[in-house]
Amino acid sequence: MKIVNIIGGLGNQMFQYAFAVALKKENPDEMVYIDTHHFNYLFVKKYKTSNLHNGYELEKLFSNIDIEKAPISMLMKVTNYIPNFFLSRVARKVLPKRHTEYVAKLSESQTYIPGILSLAGNVYYEGYWQAAQYYINCREKLCYAFAHPKPNEYNAKLIKEITNSSSVGIHVRRGNYLLSPTYSGICNLEYYKKAIVRIKSDGKQHRFYIFSNDINWCRQNIVPLLGDSEVLFVTENTGVNSCWDMFLMSYCRDLIMANSSFSWWGAFLNNNAERVIAPYPWMNGRDTSGIYAPEWIKIDC
């Protein structure tokens, strides 16, 4: 039996679910579950704006999620179960780790760990599992699992435009990233300049779609880099609808990523992309070489 902990925002939940899918592919005769219990208790609502974001979102968005949630009886067999994410983190520092638990270090998040999918016996997996190599062989299954719901009129129109043009998605994430020692300073203006030059080197007339939580900054700083190219700002997908920026990115012919899980999934789920450009490194002070799919173009930052 294998159980994968689900926690964090939508992008991280997708990585963790994808890891469960990869486990099932590697261990077809074993039971594989996901653990979503940390989202079920009122205590987490107080902390919703930190790392729990909009709560458990996978089944709200995706109708093809088919890995079952672990019942408490199963959890008790493999982990020191406490039905609260924050209290369980405290307990992990006090109680010894059980032999059935594999708790990945943060430094391992973007690193492929050989043999991790084939550990013998009952295992409870806790981590972020953001290495692309885990998912290359189950990409078709993940595209099916993460097929988006029916779009509203605004996004349906954009999907049609994006698929019928020489579209380039540019994702710019600012906000809390500006103060983060882990993420700040990587996707700077020089990165976007290099990426845009790379895209425009083919001589085509591109239409650029800008996805960002700071549109005003993009108007002042990104638009001047685009010359006379057509530019459209995607502005209506906010709050619980912000996931639609990720879905729209998955239709773009070319994509300039930010160092964001939304960018990652927009690129990975994209069946139309001719070029995907990604920043390197992905994070400051950490080996993130495993997060990149082999075909992505890395630009040094």
Regions found by a protein language model. Name each.
Residues 1-3:
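Extreme N-terminal starter segment of soluble prokaryotic enzymes
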Residues 5-15, 43-45:
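A short, glycine/small-residue-rich beta-strand->loop->alpha-helix junction that serves as a flexible
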Residues 10, 201-278, 283-286:
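Donor-binding and catalytic core of enzymes assembling or modifying cell-surface/extracellular glycoconjugates
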Residues 13-25, 192-200:
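Histidine-anchored nucleotide/phosphate-binding helix
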Residues 30-42:
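A short beta-strand-loop structural module common to alpha/beta enzyme folds
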Residues 44-62, 218-227, 289-293:
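Short, aromatic/basic amphipathic alpha-helical patches
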Residues 48-203:
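Secretory-pathway luminal glycosyltransferase catalytic domains
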Residues 285-301:
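Leloir-type glycosyltransferase catalytic cores
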